[in-house]
Amino acid sequence: GAGKTTLMRLLCNIQNPTSGKILLNGKNIVGLGERYRNLLGYLPQHFGYYPDFSAFDFLLYVSALKGLDEKAARKKSKELLEAVDLSRESKHKIKTFSGGMKQRLGIAQAMLNDPHILILDEPTAGLDPKERVRFRNLISAFSKDRIVILSTHIVSDVEFIAEEIIMMKSGQIIHFGNPQEITSEIDGQVWECTVPPAYAEKHAAAYNTSNLRNISGNQTILRIIGDRPSMENAVRVQPTLEDLYLFYFKGGCEE
């Protein structure tokens, strides 16, 4: 509900802004029309496909919509199916694919026109951890020599691959910068302390707790965000993106 998908649709010129404008090289994208769209590759959160199409036929179909000639489309489709590890399933119907396979096909169709700007709206939503890692690696591989804009609410999606992060809340941008810059806001406000397991849940409920971990020796480590907790053994630790996320979205900062 922060406005991520709306922002993605605005960037793709699917929706027009009610105020303000989006510029590309100093020009409003609304006036650029097809010239702008030719630079884009877009994977929406729920991309449409014909379930009885094979993966290869689907890419040929999207290539035709994008104006690619047939010879170039066939060559590019084969290359992309290989790149997203779907070449063995190229003749299989899409309705037989897993969620991760469909998402990999989705990024392949977004890359057909070799876009300068690749926009991905929550591409890892619903994927299992293994597919999520595979998809992140795929995004990193495709990011060379192009701008990749990725929306997600999953911190690990951006923690390892993003050079710059925009954090949104209630339709507003509240942070922009590289991971080190934006996490510096809560330097000195992240703590770890050890408590007996019997008191762990009580302490966790009393503070903005980002993690609770049982360790050997019958102890529990709490990771707490905010002012120094009352436990004497509390020590400051380096903040992470997840800590910052919880600071803003779990009681550390009001709307």
Listing of model-derived features with the role each one plays in the protein:
Residues 12:
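Helix-to-loop junction immediately C-terminal to a conserved catalytic motif
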Residues 20-31, 35-36:
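Conserved ABC transporter NBD signature motif
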Residues 93-97:
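Conserved ABC ATPase signature
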Residues 60, 64, 71-89:
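Conserved ABC ATPase "signature" region
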Residues 107:
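Hydrophobic anchor residue at the start of the ABC signature
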